[in-house]
Amino acid sequence: SRIKVEPARGSGHAWGTEMKGDVSLLRTRIGASGMDYKGYNIATHEFGHNVEQTITTEMVDYFPLYGVPNTAFTEALAFIFQKRDLTLLGLQEKNPLKEHMMALDNAWACYEIMGVSLVDVNVWKWLYNHPHASAGELKEAVLSIAREIWNRYYADVFGSKDEPILAIYSHMIENPLYLSAYPIGHLIDFQIEQYLSGKDFAAEIMRIYSQGRLIPQLWMQGAVGSPLSAEPTLKAAEQALQVVK
């Protein structure tokens, strides 16, 4: 096996290897009473990362191109695996509206995490303009920017103003400009899922992710035969709204 499982102090993460023959680490939360569903669900997400890390390290034919174009592409496979958590347990979803519900879920997930991404981008713009800011000043700036983004894009939908919830992700300080990988990852995930329908899952994932670290649109063309776009997600969500009441 190229994946080693370890307990996580936090919620969990995947740590990839940097050389062939080594193992990637899958870390997830296992409580005193054992693993609960949340820990398992996170573990399947991280497992998707580990599979990507293994394929893109071991199976890219030109090693200097090992990896993926950017973080969004590994998040996409993590989302694809995470959605299959119950299937891995032998539980089959028989809801006839599943496809439409998944389309709506993907669109909504993009909408939610895009707000956090915008906070991330604007916080770093603020930091560039205030290079000597203290931790306290940064905290107040993050909260102010979070409220501003909320009021602009979310207040009318949720019916409340000045909510600071979009400031919750510490990623934006620990891993600068990482959070935008999530909404783009959802778009990639959706396009790959559409492409995978009726095909051999394992064979296609191996083929797609063994392309290596190409430029994003070239990678997408090779993966699904079309460029990265929000259009498939928006179109599917619009169709779903005609069916799901």
PLM regions: where:
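N-terminal maturation segment of proteins
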Residues: 83, 96-128, 145-152, 171
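C-terminal, non-catalytic "cap/extension" segments appended to globular domains
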Residues: 127, 131-245
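Short acidic (Asp/Glu) and glycine-rich catalytic loops that position anionic groups and cofactors
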Residues: 21-26, 54-62, 93-100, 119-128, ...
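Alpha-helix capping and helix-loop boundary segments enriched in small/acidic/polar residues
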Residues: 13-14, 30-42, 64-73, 102, ...
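A glycine-rich phosphate-binding loop feature that marks nucleotide/adenosyl-phosphate handling sites
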Residues: 2-9, 69, 73, 98-101, ...
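Post-HExxH zinc-binding segment in Zn-dependent metallohydrolases
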Residues: 55-106, 185, 225
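Auxiliary, metal-adjacent structural segments of Zn-dependent hydrolase domains
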Residues: 1-22
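Active-site recognition of the HExxH zinc-binding catalytic motif
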Residues: 26-57, 78-79
